[in-house]
């Protein structure tokens, strides 16, 4: 062990009792735990001086990632700049965008044609060759650190590619490797699993198991080439934790734990959100606090709010530092399609009731599809809206099948028998910018751009870290060329994963273009957010009655400052507001109001209203 009183020993001592208790609760294996501790110390010893210095700074400032000026962007390395060196060369553009949190989509080695967009990893310590090398990743991380940009990377925990060395050895029958996965010699147990385990991809990859050429059966909850890891085996947890720390030591600031609710399997359950998952998440949090305390864990939990919040853990025993605000994202698009903010109001009331320590990543679009995980029992009780029919309406609206819809999207995993499908498309295309530009209609284009900016204003109004999907800052449209790619044509998510069009992005500098209007609109919003204390993570936030179901009203307070945010989700002019007297100033355009009980909002428009200094609250 490290010498007495060393930094490592001090951190380990703080967590050792709980860490050992949880580890032995799962594994009852002293030898594996001893190896685990040795691995942690070895990983700490391999951490270079600049990272250890950053660890010390962030330990002294544990809320560093809760600043209101944090702005994220997620992107694919190849689509954005070709390779990692190209991304490094484009850091000035990211700084122009105001980005100081950069999430690189999966870039570790994965087989061509069987990669699931990089989520089928065949080597956790090798970068996909066409994207660069591990040295290039470390060089980019160093450059980001100097530029004040935190770097995030995905860590695929639930499964490996069938081409991973462990999987190849398991297939060949090498001792100790079948036990790293879920192998069976007959369908008896797999059929029992499938009685209770929901299918992830019922259309494109039905079932949860795959039979190999040699007759063996292996668990594959996602795609047949992604073999689920068995975390009941302590060597799997030990080795995957070591891989995570290897990546952390390359200079990453945030590690996204992909599909974390799925990582523990138990016969007779749905194999989702089991108690052991939280034990593993808690141990990973302690591992980071011991070895690399400047590194944050971002949990990918794409589920309803009641199942998301537990992944924060508790103040005494935290798990993930941050989680995605998935339900609010999906509810936002529902609200745009219906023109009614009632469900979004209910959703935000639930979010506002959570402890302020809980930090969400807020977003409109990402690399993935939009799944319609809404509060259907409430919709049915309140509006007699039924799940299957409503999902069809939403998908029809956003794929332009509904009369009058300006949206241009495509369906993903369409399952007519189940009455279910998910949605793909960029923000600009779903807001109608693509259709209006194609039609050459300046009036429609102005409305669509306004809608796009309003949705971003809504995202920026929420507590947490706002994250933009690369290209949205300049109104990137859908990329339909994936239809011509045999490796991608079956996956409509590539509709919004196309190459960044640098030529069109240059139009952000030309006044009057929609690219310039979107880019400058978003930069103005981001600058206002960074400078206004009401957007602090610790601000008091509540939803208020706007007097109109089409308009959502959000009130943020910090000290004696108050900001009222109004959002019109309908395509009509609306008069709405909150019960306030006294002077208010609209931050985006500078309009002054003596009262905001009823102000005019443009179709799909918004207002950020700051109470004037000295004005009295009604």
How should these model regions be labeled?
Residues 1-583, 587-618:
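Active-site and adjacent substrate-binding regions of carbohydrate-active enzymes
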């Amino acid at each position: 062990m490290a010498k007495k009183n060393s930094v490592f020993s001090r951190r380990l001592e703080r967590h050792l009792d709980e860490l050992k208790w949880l580890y032995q609760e799962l594994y009852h294996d002293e030898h594996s735990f001893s190896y685990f501790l040795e691995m942690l110390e070895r990983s700490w010893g391999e951490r270079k001086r600049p990272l250890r210095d950053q660890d010390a700074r962030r330990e002294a400032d544990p809320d560093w990632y809760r600043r209101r000026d944090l702005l994220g962007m997620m992107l694919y390395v190849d689509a954005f700049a070709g390779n990692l060196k190209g991304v490094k060369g484009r850091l000035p553009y990211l700084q122009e965008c105001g980005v100081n949190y950069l999430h690189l989509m999966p870039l570790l080695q994965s087989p061509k044609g069987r990669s699931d967009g990089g989520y089928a990893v065949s080597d956790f310590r090798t970068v996909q060759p066409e994207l660069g090398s591990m040295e290039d990743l470390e060089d980019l991380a160093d450059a980001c650190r100097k530029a004040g940009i935190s770097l995030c990377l995905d860590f695929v925990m639930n499964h490996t590619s069938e081409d991973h060395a462990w999987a190849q050895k398991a297939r060949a029958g090498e001792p100790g490797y079948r036990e790293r996965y879920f192998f069976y010699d007959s369908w008896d147990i797999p059929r029992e699993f499938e009685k209770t385990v929901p299918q992830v991809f019922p259309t494109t990859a039905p079932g949860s198991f795959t039979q190999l050429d040699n007759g063996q059966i292996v668990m594959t909850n996602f795609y047949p080439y992604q073999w689920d890891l068995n975390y009941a085996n302590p060597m799997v947890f030990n080795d995957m934790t070591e891989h995570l720390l290897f990546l952390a030591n390359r200079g990453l600031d945030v590690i996204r734990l992909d599909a974390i609710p799925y990582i523990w399997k138990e016969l007779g359950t749905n194999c989702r959100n089991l108690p052991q998952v939280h034990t593993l998440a808690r141990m990973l949090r302690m591992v980071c606090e011991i070895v690399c305390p400047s590194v944050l864990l971002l949990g990918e939990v794409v589920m309803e709010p009641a199942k998301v919040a537990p992944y924060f853990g508790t103040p005494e025993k935290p798990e993930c530092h941050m989680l995605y605000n998935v339900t609010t994202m999906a509810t936002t698009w529902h609200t745009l399609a219906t023109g009614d903010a009632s469900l979004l109001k209910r959703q935000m009331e639930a979010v506002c009731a959570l402890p302020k320590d809980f930090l969400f990543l807020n977003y409109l679009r990402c690399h993935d599809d939009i799944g319609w995980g809404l509060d259907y029992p409430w919709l049915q009780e309140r509006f007699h809206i039924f799940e299957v029919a409503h999902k069809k309406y939403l998908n029809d609206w956003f794929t332009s099948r509904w009369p009058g819809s300006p949206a241009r999207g495509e369906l993903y995993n369409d399952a007519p028998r189940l009455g279910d499908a998910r949605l793909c498309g960029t923000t600009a295309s779903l807001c109608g910018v693509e259709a209006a530009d194609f039609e050459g209609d300046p009036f429609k284009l102005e409305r669509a751009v306004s809608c796009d900016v309003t949705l971003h204003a809504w995202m920026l109004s929420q507590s947490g870290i706002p994250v933009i999907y690369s290209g949205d800052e300049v109104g990137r449209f859908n990329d339909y060329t994936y239809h011509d790619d045999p490796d991608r044509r079956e996956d409509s998510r590539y509709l919004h994963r196309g190459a960044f069009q640098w030529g069109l992005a240059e139009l952000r500098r030309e006044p009057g273009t929609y690219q310039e209007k979107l880019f400058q609109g978003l930069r103005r919003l981001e600058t206002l957010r960074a400078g206004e204390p009401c957007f602090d993570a610790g601000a008091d936030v509540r939803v208020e009655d706007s007097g109109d179901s089409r308009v959502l009203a959000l009130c943020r307070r910090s000290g004696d400052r108050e900001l009222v945010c109004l959002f019109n989700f309908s395509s009509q002019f609306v008069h709405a507001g909150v019960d306030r007297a006294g002077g208010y100033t609209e931050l985006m355009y500078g309009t002054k109001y003596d009262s905001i009980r009823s102000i005019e909002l443009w179709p799909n428009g918004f207002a950020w209203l700051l109470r004037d200094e000295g004005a009295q609250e009604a």
